[in-house]
Regions:
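Rhodanese-like catalytic fold shared by cysteine-dependent sulfurtransferases
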Residues: 2-139, 158-161, 167-207, 212-281
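A short acidic-Thr-Gly-centered motif at the start of a beta-strand
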Residues: 147-158
């Protein structure tokens, strides 16, 4: 499996040669990436889950970020491959997380400087009651189908296609789908207001929202559906899922990621790798 994030868990395994010289080591996954699920599931006691997650990650020597909320868990962890897998096996042993699909990727060096485990009101702050992922998913479009639509310039019903980037301007600066509607936002909470001037131009189109791995576009799609937009889909698996399954067709640039690799190209190769990755985490 190449570098990349899943919309659920995204452990990154790394190894080194004897003598400390780094090497790239691909780590295979037994999971079918087409069965990815978002990490949304009800968590009754987020604090207790976070505390155990932290203790087990510390004991295993893992670094990265774990976010726990009443709506689920999301994380990216890096460490020795077996240590990452053991941690994931612990989480999956709990029935509510048993179906989570994990993608493994690799790095020449540890891309995180420390371990951060946080309890949050939401996995990603949006502050919209009508965007609760526990109430159901918004409709999705598979990467291969979106690539076909991009190629033909419309969806399968001949309807005009608009790609809606739900990420912030820093992320967009690294790349986006060609011709996508991008918004001048710095925080995800600004998205609803930033979309208001564009609502008329979206009315007669099939709108596909997208983000890095699927969490933000899920919430954005749910909110816009509740706000009366019934022509909206979300890209299943986000940009990185698209890269993995399709490549870079219709995409210009890289996809920003929230670790020391900075951004990934459509071949899922990092902008920054090796020892530099440790310095920029």
């Amino acid at each position: 499996m190449r570098d990349g994030y899943a919309p659920t868990l995204a452990p990154v395994a790394y190894t080194r040669r004897e003598g400390g010289l780094p090497r790239r080591t691909p780590v295979k996954s037994a999971d079918d990436p087409q069965r990815c699920r978002l990490p949304f599931t009800a968590v009754d006691n987020p604090q207790a889950l976070a505390e155990e997650a932290r203790a087990r990650a510390v004991a295993a020597g893992l670094r990265g970020t774990v976010r726990v909320a009443g709506e689920g868990i999301n994380l990216v962890l890096a460490g020795a491959g077996e240590a990452v897998r053991t941690w994931v096996d612990w989480l999956r042993a709990e029935p509510r997380f048993a179906g989570l699909v994990v993608k493994e990727s690799y790095s020449r060096a540890q891309p995180f400087q420390r371990l951060k485990v946080k309890v949050k009101p939401e996995l990603i702050s949006f502050r919209r009651a009508d965007a609760s992922p526990l109430q159901g998913r918004a409709p999705t479009v598979a990467p291969a189908d979106l690539a076909r639509w991009i190629g033909q310039g419309c969806d399968d019903k001949g309807r005009r296609l608009v790609l809606l980037d739900t990420r912030n301007r820093e992320e967009v600066g690294h790349g986006s789908f060609v011709g996508a509607l991008t918004l001048p936002i710095d925080n995800f909470t600004e998205l609803p207001a930033a979309l208001v001037p564009h609502r008329d131009e979206l009315a007669d189109a099939t709108v596909v929202s997208f983000c890095t791995g699927g969490i933000r576009c899920e919430k954005a799609a749910l909110h816009l559906q509740a706000d009366g937009m019934d022509n909206l889909l979300q890209l299943d698996g986000g940009i990185l899922g698209y890269f993995e399954q399709v490549g870079g067709f219709g995409y210009d640039g890289r996809c920003f990621v929230f670790d020391g690799r900075v951004a990934l190209d459509p071949a899922l190769e990092p902008l920054v790798d090796g020892d530099e990755a440790m310095a920029t985490g």
